Design a protein with these regions (language model features):
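Expand to "…catalyze enediolate/carbanion chemistry for C-C bond making/breaking, isomerization
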Residues: 1-190
Length: 190
């Protein structure tokens, strides 16, 4: 089936690969698997190999509730830092789109949401789920390259294209092939 408006499906409560594959086979749309339980976390590797999977996300509130994590505690923060890193590594290892951050439930606390969005952007996440219209601009800004990042990337790529050198310095920063590739990616995404 071809869909003109729908470009993908966020599938909640994923616990096994076959759920992702069933939705993909039925709808022929890329799937974002939302991991929301200990069972789902334990199956991350298998889920990441699902046919039709585009990206992983997670449900912070459901996981916190199931595991009886104390909301706002350092322990809860540590748990989700670990989970984010695990999801990011599994996504990279299986060539998925970078993960999508869970919702930020306190939609009136724009400062805290901005900090969270910036943090997960720095971790290499590709976006963030939003539950309120006021969150959309905050998320969009967090996952957009800054003017200074774009300017630096442009200088790097211009120097690389002009000289062919794969090791050089720009603005006192050592540049080698991984930095060049990162700059190319940044400019392509902008």
């Amino acid at each position: 089936a071809e869909h003109e408006v729908i470009s993908g499906i966020v599938l909640p409560k994923v616990t096994k690969a076959s759920q992702v594959e069933l939705v993909f086979e039925s709808l022929k749309l890329p799937v974002v698997a939302q991991i929301e339980s200990a069972q789902g976390i334990s199956q991350l590797e298998a889920i990441a190999q699902s046919e039709g999977l585009m990206a992983l996300s997670y449900g912070r509130l459901d996981i916190s509730n199931e595991l009886d994590l104390t909301a706002g505690s350092q322990a809860e923060q540590d748990f989700f830092t670990h989970l984010r890193i695990q999801i990011r590594l599994v996504s990279q290892a299986h060539n998925l789109t970078a993960p999508i951050e869970s919702i930020y439930a306190d939609f009136k606390n724009e400062t805290a949401m901005k900090a969270t969005a910036g943090y997960v952007s720095d971790l290499g996440f590709s976006g963030m789920l939003c539950i309120h219209p006021r969150q959309v601009n905050i998320a969009n800004q967090a996952f957009k390259a800054s003017d200074s990042q774009l300017a630096f990337a442009t200088k790097v790529i211009e120097h690389y294209q002009k000289t062919g050198d794969s090791t050089f310095a720009i603005e006192g920063v050592m540049v080698d092939l991984p930095v060049i590739l990162q700059c190319q990616r940044l400019l392509q995404q902008s």
